[in-house]
């Protein structure tokens, strides 16, 4: 199997040669560069002057005069502007979610070069001057008409009044916010993108050639950026696709574009591929394809040892399987821990590259217990702690590991019915003295939490020599928690975050509960365990995808937004159709070069899972030329 990155490395070396020092290779994400560098080194028996590797977001950051704003600070700055413009009395913790949403909308506005004044104009004005919108095509005009049919300005309700009132302020908030951020020398990503595009001078760029590899959906800024560099003779483009989904007609009624190939076809027309079409006909080549239904999520994880043995056995003796040619792709990241527990000992190396919910780690429950202890669990008027808050801390595994007195103290408090113990009763060793010292003020609370996390770090340092995959994961969760709390502490100490301790409690809990750990290992070694997004540009010989259910791929529902769907569509912004097409591309692109493909889905209906296979599986079942084996898991055995 020849991978896409191998093809690119081979072609680029033939065209440019050994000296790639004046070349920047741009990927959608940084991960692919590690694989690519290995393939590039194989092209020559002599030393190669290495190119620069950069992700698209890093490239725009390098070209921007501003620093990337800390996400928490960005919301805090928006909160100040929001209160000034609306005279709202909303608290920061109530605003925080809406603030993230608004920044996401502004980000999309800028990345798609939307005229913010027109978008956020008074809705009545927008309706009145709709006919003058020459920049809209017929489809966009229809989207605006549908919006006003469904959203009658004349029929006012309390909810509509609130929406219209806020909408009329969004333009002022947008401009005021961007002005304030520029004054501070920081920006959100879309603001950087727009500025770089508007001020771009290709002849002043650092590198002679910019090689764009493996992109799919492009926003307006990226498209314009690519065009400017192509016109300046500085750009090369490598697109990955398969003729199966760029040529496939549906019901013989052209024009029809397969969902997975919709954006690639647009890109190929504007930016021709450096590679010939002949190398992109692999999806129709012989493959072993299996669809397996499972009764539960965990049953899929327990099937892994059998799958690993089957792909190892299938290989010929003269071509033994390499672990890095095997990939376990999780459509549901909550399956990571069951999957790690299920990997057999014969797998020597495992590399995890995916986001994992911080809320599913021991560090999260420990920090949450400490926050409750020092806020709602401590009565400042009596100087006593609440028993339930104390018990949660004493029973936690981290406390038991760091304190020899914790277990005995917990039993004593229970036996003596000490429902409101004094701090002095609880300080029975050095660690417990740190834990049960009351903290007042938001800065003191954050400092306390970082000190506690440093104590926990000692535990993981002691176990570091074992190189256990779970310890690696928990160390990442510790670092993520420490970084997040320390960022808040810096904002507080710099006077940029001035809130009540109860607001800080809710804000901390919200931030920790919604955070993901960006877990990164050594990608060029071992079996790969990853999420769907992390598979971009990578190819694997043996592939298993878990939780390939409708609702998991593509994810159920669209992203929340202040900007209604029809207006997003009319102004050329990102919509749910874009995201579904992106996931369709990820699915087909991942399968196209694999030789052994096993797709599992859960038949139980719970949460996001509807108990049915993903639409992409159904589509592949109907359209693909392969004979697909349909099986089911029963008591851990495939039947």
Give the label of every model feature segment.
Residues 1-568, 625-631, 635:
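Nucleic acid-machinery interaction/catalytic patches
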Residues 365, 388, 392, 549-639:
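Accessory/regulatory regions of helicases
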């Amino acid at each position: 199997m020849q991978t896409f990155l191998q093809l690119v490395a081979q072609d680029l070396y033939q065209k440019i040669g050994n000296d790639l020092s004046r070349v920047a290779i741009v990927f959608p994400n940084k991960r692919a560069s590690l694989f690519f560098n290995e393939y590039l080194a194989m092209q020559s028996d002599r030393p190669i002057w290495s190119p620069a590797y950069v992700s698209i977001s890093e490239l725009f950051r390098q070209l921007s005069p501003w620093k990337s704003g800390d996400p928490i600070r960005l919301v805090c700055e928006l909160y100040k502007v929001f209160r000034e413009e609306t005279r709202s009395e909303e608290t920061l913790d109530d605003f925080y979610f809406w603030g993230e949403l608004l920044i996401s909308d502004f980000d999309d506005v800028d990345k798609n070069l939307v005229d913010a004044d027109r978008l956020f104009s008074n809705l009545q004005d927008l309706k009145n001057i709709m006919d003058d919108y020459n920049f809209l095509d017929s489809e966009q005009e229809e989207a605006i008409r549908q919006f006003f049919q469904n959203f009658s300005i004349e029929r006012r309700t309390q909810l509509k009044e609130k929406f219209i009132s806020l909408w009329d302020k969004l333009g002022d908030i947008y401009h005021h916010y961007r002005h304030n951020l520029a004054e501070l020398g920081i920006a959100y990503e879309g603001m950087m993108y727009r500025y770089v595009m508007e001020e771009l001078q290709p002849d002043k760029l650092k590198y002679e050639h910019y090689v764009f590899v493996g992109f799919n959906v492009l926003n307006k800024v990226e498209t314009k950026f690519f065009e400017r560099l192509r016109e300046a003779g500085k750009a090369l483009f490598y697109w990955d696709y398969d003729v199966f989904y760029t040529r496939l007609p549906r019901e013989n009624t052209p024009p029809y574009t397969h969902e997975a190939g919709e954006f690639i076809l647009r890109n190929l027309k504007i930016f021709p591929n450096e590679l010939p079409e002949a190398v992109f006909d692999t999806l129709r080549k012989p493959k072993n394809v299996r669809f397996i239904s499972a009764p539960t999520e965990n049953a899929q994880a327990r099937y892994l040892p059998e799958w690993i043995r089957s792909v190892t056995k299938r290989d010929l003796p003269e071509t033994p399987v390499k672990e890095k040619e095997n990939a376990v792709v999780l459509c549901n990241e909550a399956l990571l821990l069951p999957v790690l527990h299920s990997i057999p000992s014969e797998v020597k190396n495992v590399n995890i590259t995916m986001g994992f919910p911080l809320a599913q780690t021991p560090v999260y429950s420990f920090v949450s217990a400490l926050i409750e202890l020092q806020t709602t669990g401590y009565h400042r008027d009596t100087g006593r702690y609440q028993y339930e808050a104390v018990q949660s801390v004493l029973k936690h595994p981290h406390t038991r590991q760091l304190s020899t007195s914790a277990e005995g103290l917990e039993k004593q408090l229970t036996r003596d019915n000490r429902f409101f113990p004094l701090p002095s009763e609880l300080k029975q060793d050095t660690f417990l003295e740190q834990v049960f010292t009351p903290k007042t003020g938001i800065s003191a609370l954050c400092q306390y939490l970082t000190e506690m996390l440093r104590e926990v770090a000692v535990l993981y340092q002691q176990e570091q020599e074992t190189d256990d995959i779970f310890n690696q994961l928990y160390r990442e969760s510790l670092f993520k928690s420490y970084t997040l709390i320390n960022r808040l502490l810096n904002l507080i100490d710099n006077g940029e975050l001035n809130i009540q301790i109860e607001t800080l409690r809710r804000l901390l809990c919200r931030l920790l509960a919604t955070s993901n750990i960006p877990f990164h290992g050594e990608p060029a070694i071992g079996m790969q365990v990853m999420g769907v997004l992390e598979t971009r540009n990578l190819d694997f010989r043996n592939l298993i995808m878990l939780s390939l259910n409708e609702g998991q791929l593509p994810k159920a529902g669209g992203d929340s937004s202040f900007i209604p769907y029809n207006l997003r569509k009319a102004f050329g912004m990102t919509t749910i159709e874009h995201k579904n097409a992106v996931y369709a591309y990820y699915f087909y692109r991942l399968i196209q070069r694999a030789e052994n493909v096993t797709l599992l889905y859960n038949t139980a209906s719970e949460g996001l899972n509807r108990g049915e296979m993903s639409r992409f599986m159904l589509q592949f079942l109907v359209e693909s030329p392969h004979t697909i084996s349909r099986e089911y898991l029963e008591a851990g055995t495939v039947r």
